């Protein structure tokens, strides 16, 4: 019969199945669940004995609690990592600070800081990927400029950069004993952000010292927030580079904001990417600047910002 039906009509005949009441699966509004009925028929479950109510209720409860249990597991895992991260940090921080305060040579201080920063990243399972490291490993004077995304940017850069630098930090950090000693021993330069006259004097001072042993490193955004995105870059770093006629090396930081955001002390797992660009030489901008220092600073800023925006993985907030 099935063969004749297929020959005459081109389709197999329907299979009529007699099932007990309530065997046809329906929605809460009474509509037939055709896909579910088809699956039950193909698996031989259509018309079988109904499962006990307590079994059905157990399946419903399990289906409802499974996502909650998954969220709970993730929350516990994240909290465990955060506690572990702070324990590791506070175990490494005191000997690191003491080494910075007591070692007599800046090169020794930087070597110790680099070892401790890399050890911290390794113990926390945070991978730091660096591209273009050779661009920063130059013997000539230069100014490095990066975006600022998190409290941990400085630690990451100490671990990632191929040579020591002198971070340019806000003068407010001088008020704290711990920060003042630590940053001063690193060779940091402090600038005033809110006093215009002092800020101008700091800019002139930085322009005069760009040819010293280690290059200056600026976080040109000036600050960071929880909101992802690249903010406008302040001109101080670029004016210093233009006045002293040294190249600017752009550095893009990606991933640190998601690990430790502004206003949060709950570190999370993640990976970090550092993209170091080719030095931007004033000679390559001569057609745009025409020998004018201010135009040179603007051109350096625009080129640097373009590199950072391409590699930081965040939107443009300018």
Language model regions located:
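Generic structural signal for residues in well-ordered beta-strands
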Residues: 13-18, 128-130, 274
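Catalytic core of membrane glycerolipid acyltransferases/transacylases, capturing the structured
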Residues: 92-110, 121-123, 137-196
């Amino acid at each position: 019969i099935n063969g004749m039906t297929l020959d005459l009509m081109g389709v197999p005949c329907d299979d009529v199945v007699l099932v007990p009441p309530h065997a046809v699966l329906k929605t809460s509004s009474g509509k037939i669940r055709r896909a579910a009925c088809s699956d039950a028929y193909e698996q031989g479950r259509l018309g079988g004995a109904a499962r006990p109510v307590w079994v059905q209720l157990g399946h419903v409860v399990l289906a409802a609690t499974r996502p909650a249990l998954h969220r709970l597991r993730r929350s516990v895992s994240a909290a465990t990592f955060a506690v572990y991260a702070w324990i590791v940090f506070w175990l490494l921080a005191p000997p690191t600070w003491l080494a910075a305060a007591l070692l007599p040579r800046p090169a020794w201080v930087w070597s110790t800081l680099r070892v401790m920063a890399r050890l911290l990243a390794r113990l926390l399972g945070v991978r730091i990927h660096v591209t273009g490291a050779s661009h920063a490993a130059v013997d000539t004077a230069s100014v490095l400029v990066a975006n600022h995304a998190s409290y941990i940017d400085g630690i990451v850069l100490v671990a990632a950069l191929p040579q020591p630098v002198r971070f340019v930090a806000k003068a407010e950090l001088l008020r704290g004993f711990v920060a003042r000693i630590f940053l001063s021993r690193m060779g940091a330069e402090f600038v005033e952000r809110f006093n215009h006259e002092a800020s101008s004097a700091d800019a002139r001072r930085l322009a005069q010292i760009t040819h010293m042993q280690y290059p200056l490193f600026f976080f040109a955004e000036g600050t960071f927030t929880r909101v992802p995105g690249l903010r406008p870059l302040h001109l101080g770093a670029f004016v210093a580079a233009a006045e002293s006629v040294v190249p600017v090396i752009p550095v893009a930081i990606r991933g640190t904001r998601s690990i430790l955001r502004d206003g949060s002390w709950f570190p999370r797992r993640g990976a970090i990417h550092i993209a170091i660009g080719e030095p931007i030489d004033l000679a390559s901008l001569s057609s745009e600047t025409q020998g004018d220092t201010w135009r040179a600073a603007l051109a350096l800023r625009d080129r640097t910002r373009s590199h950072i925006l391409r590699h930081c993985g965040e939107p443009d907030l300018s």
